[in-house]
Amino acid sequence: MAVPRRKTSPSRRGMRRSADALKTPTYAEDKDSGELRRPHHLDLKTGMYKGRQVLKKKES
C-alpha cells in the first residue's frame, strides 16, 4: 500500500484546497434589453447571441 513519505504541511494542503471554493457566477448587462445574463450565453427572452437571432423570441 502506498504511504506518503512526508506529512503534508498545512500550507500545501491549503493551496491544494484553494480551487475547491464555490465562486459566485458573473453577470453582464445585455446591450439590447438591459437584462442581466451570463457572459458568452444567449438571452433566452430575446433569443439573441452576439447580435444575431439564434432562437425564436419567447412569447410571454
Curated annotation (Swiss-Prot):
GO biological processes: translation
Entry keyword set: Ribonucleoprotein, Ribosomal protein
Domain of life: Bacteria
GO MF terms, alphabetically ordered: structural constituent of ribosome
UniProt family annotation: Belongs to the bacterial ribosomal protein bL32 family.
The keyword Ribonucleoprotein appears for this protein: yes
Regions of compositional bias (Basic and acidic residues) in chain numbering: 28-44
The protein, known as: Large ribosomal subunit protein bL32
One Pfam family in the UniProt entry: Ribosomal_L32p
Biased composition (Basic residues): 1-16
Cellular component per GO, a single term: large ribosomal subunit
Region of interest: Disordered: 1-60
